[in-house]
Amino acid sequence: MVSKSDQLLIVVSILEGRHFPKRPKHMLVVEAKFDGEQLATDPVDHTDQPEFATELAWEIDRKALHQHRLQRTPIKLQCFALDPVTSAKETIGYIVLDLRTAQETKQAPKWYQLLSNKYTKFKSEIQISIALETDTKPPVDSFKAKGAPPRDGKVPAILAGLDPRDIVAVLNEEGGYHQIGPAEYCTDSFIMSVTIAFATQLEQLIPCTMKLPERQPEFFFYYSLLGNDVTNEPFNDLINPNFEPERASVRIRSSVEILRVYLALQSKLQIHLCCGDQSLGSTEIPLTGLLKKGSTEINQHPVTVEGAFTLDPPNRAKQKLAPIPVELAPTVGVSVALQREGIDSQSLIELKTQNEHEPEHSKKKVLTPIKEKTLTGPKSPTVSPVPSHNQSPPTKDDATESEVESLQYDKDTKPNPKASSSVPASLAQLVTTSNASEVASGQKIAVPATSHHFCFSIDLRSIHALEIGFPINCILRYSYPFFGSAAPIMTNPPVEVRKNMEVFLPQSYCAFDFATMPHQLQDTFLRIPLLVELWHKDKMSKDLLLGIARIQLSNILSSEKTRFLGSNGEQCWRQTYSESVPVIAAQGSNNRIADLSYTVTLEDYGLVKMREIFISDSSQGVSAVQQKPSSLPPAPCPSEIQTEPRETLEYKAALELEMWKEMQEDIFENQLKQKELAHMQALAEEWKKRDRERESLVKKKVAEYTILEGKLQKTLIDLEKREQQLASVESELQREKKELQSERQRNLQELQDSIRRAKEDCIHQVELERLKIKQLEEDKHRLQQQLNDAENKYKILEKEFQQFKDQQNNKPEIRLQSEINLLTLEKVELERKLESATKSKLHYKQQWGRALKELARLKQREQESQMARLKKQQEELEQMRLRYLAAEEKDTVKTERQELLDIRNELNRLRQQEQKQYQDSTEIASGKKDGPHGSVLEEGLDDYLTRLIEERDTLMRTGVYNHEDRIISELDRQIREILAKSNASN
């Protein structure tokens, strides 16, 4: 056992945050994860300074703590923005705490900046402290008396007054259940489970404009059960979603009444279909039907709410999606069950198979029971039977599709060596008698007499002139079923090809032996080209088809024939053709991406002899077994001659061999039939699957096109209405145009008439004006003469006025008036200067008062500091007084003498200043008396006296000076002297 002192608590205090943006519709949550255990704070408002004020603690002993510190186990805190409406969590950032910084002594909290912060414009920070505390939890008693549960039918008074909004689910980690309601009264145990069983028509949730991740998008269902986020296993196929039904269960401790109230508040369970962090659709399952008022079903058996619920797209996608018909609506099969703990039930969900008897909203689906775990592993590749030589080869598109599928199968699984044995290798033993296109058609193959034995070889030499901007690891792949095998032929290993380089391909030579008629060979070569696919093989991702090269095999038929001798001495013919063909891009525009150099050879070995070819089940390939009659044995013994022929060992061995051959033929035929049946079944299932996929896609497209057709019909009707409106507007425009034309002609005629009349009026007016001008010329001459006479009179009068003005300026009254004007201007200027000086003086007094107050404060502070220094010096001097008394007395005498000299000099200086001020005041007073105007001097004395009194009062109000100060005494003396002078003058 671990001692009590070894039990510790790792306490992480999450206090507050700062530099967060304001999001009123969101909440902030911080989740902390350590050693696989996750804790979270309560949601707080998403403000700029959120207040968390939460402590999160993990129990640990010292040994485990030491181990975690050695391993540098971090404590990761993730901050989320929570949407209370949709319960969607949005990652904001995270913080990583080092466990080694936690100490048992209390440490000051620190600010930690969020890493990978979503709010890039804000440097969001959270104040956190981490510490170790001794676990002081009281020991758990092995036995405690528990309160008896309330009797049925009686609700305690405390529950009757409980606010329904205060009923929440609280996780009890020690007991492993959620407590709903007061723990002392709600003691019944329940199990609540949610099962997602199936889903259909999910492709309807994805609009045509939406883009999904390119590489295997994963879809899953998400829901929150009592605050626990639950997701099912991801699946990739939306058209045929294949996933195992999963049940999520939680234990609840409550009572029936409280649980009913809680379910009434949390009335709906929302389930989302997600792809990554994006919700494609959601549905709501009502929970109020689990516990109906007054019902006691839950005491006898589990209560359930189940069915196929329609998935609705989110608001942002609903605007882009067209309305979906009811029969094509996406649905999800969900069952929510609630039962008392301890009641035995076989299954909380009973999934039924309903065909024609089910209601309208269920779409004839077979729901898989929960107990059945339908494994969805990779399917084994289906090997289609090899067509015989008289079957028509597939078209180009079909061949390409089958080749892509077979390449995927080759990547996923390794083919059975018996099922996909090398056809050329097995037929090489037949020399010139086997037909490669008839390997899988039966055990006995009849070759027509007109068929020739051909050998076709192809050598893909090199890839050059690459036009792709990145290096590729290329392999070449092709298939030509006419040669007897639909299996793809590939080069291996992949070679790296870069731009402006030529790379020779390894293992690129392949030869095919087959029997066919020359005209059929020529017809096939003319119709069907050989498609060579260029693939980029990537270890980190799926292989990529880059392009396809088309090799026209008919070119070899027009090449020159050369004669050679076969292995049996017969005359044979050979044709060879070499060429470089472009590789066309598989996607996008038909641009050349590379060039492929190849060499093909066709050898004709002549007619195939009429015979039957037997195919055995040997793993070495196909072999023809021909028994020739053995020659007579030399010198037989008499005992051997008398023995029956059927009893000889040779006959028995031959008989056993024939029986074994027949048995092997039967076994091989059965195996072929079983393989054919399995392959046909797999092919049929795949065909049905693809047919269903195509049918669902066609239905979806038909629904979309129907909606588009309706829109087009509506648009067409609108266009017809618009055309009619335009026609009516055009006719109205023509009518108005004619009216405007006639109006224009009428206005033009009126304008011509008015111009003619205006011309006549103008001619008459010109004649009148000419007469007026002649009259005005005469008046002008007369007035010009009068003007000359008036100018002469004006000059005479102006000269007389100038003489009179000069006479008036010489008089004294005029000169005095001008001086008065000048003095008035000077007076105004002096008054302005006086007012400015008065304002400056007042400002100076205010500044001087402030300076005096500041000086008093500084003086007081200096006195206090001097007193403190003096006290300190006195203490020091008291200690040294006895030792340095004589020297100190001498220094004191010198210092006092110096101070007396300084005081004497200061007194002399003050006396001189007083004398100077007295002389100035005397001069002022005498000057005022001796002036020509006595009243003006008295006014100057009064002003000077007033100024002195104001200065004295101002200095006294500052609090720095008193009546004993020298400057105040001097001001009082001057005031008394001026008062005495004024009294004497009076």
UniProtKB/Swiss-Prot annotation:
Effect of residue 199 to P: In SRTD13; also found in a patient with more complex ciliopathy
Gene3D superfamilies: C2 domain
Pfam family, one: C2
UniProt subunit comment: Interacts with TACC2, TACC3, CCDC52, TALPID3.
Domain of life: Eukaryota
Record key words, sorted: Ciliopathy, Coiled coil, Cytoplasm, Cytoskeleton, Disease variant, Joubert syndrome, Phosphoprotein, Repeat
One of the GO BP terms on file: centrosome cycle
Role summary: Plays a role in the microtubule-dependent coupling of the nucleus and the centrosome. Involved in the processes that regulate centrosome-mediated interkinetic nuclear migration (INM) of neural progenitors and for proper positioning of neurons during brain development. Also implicated in the migration and selfrenewal of neural progenitors. Required for centriole duplication and maturation during mitosis and subsequent ciliogenesis. Required for the recruitment of CEP295 to the proximal end of new-born centrioles at the centriolar microtubule wall during early S phase in a PLK4-dependent manner.
Record organism: Homo sapiens (Human)
Entry similarity comment: Belongs to the CEP120 family.
Outcome, altering residue 726 to P: In JBTS31; uncertain significance
Gene name as annotated: CEP120
Location within or outside the cell: Cytoplasm, Cytoskeleton, Microtubule organizing center, Centrosome
Compositionally biased spans, kind Polar residues: 377-394, 915-924
Annotated positions of the Phosphoserine modification: 935
Any one GO CC term of the record: cytoplasm
Full protein name: Centrosomal protein of 120 kDa
Coiled-coil regions listed: 669-925
Region span, Disordered: 350-424, 914-937
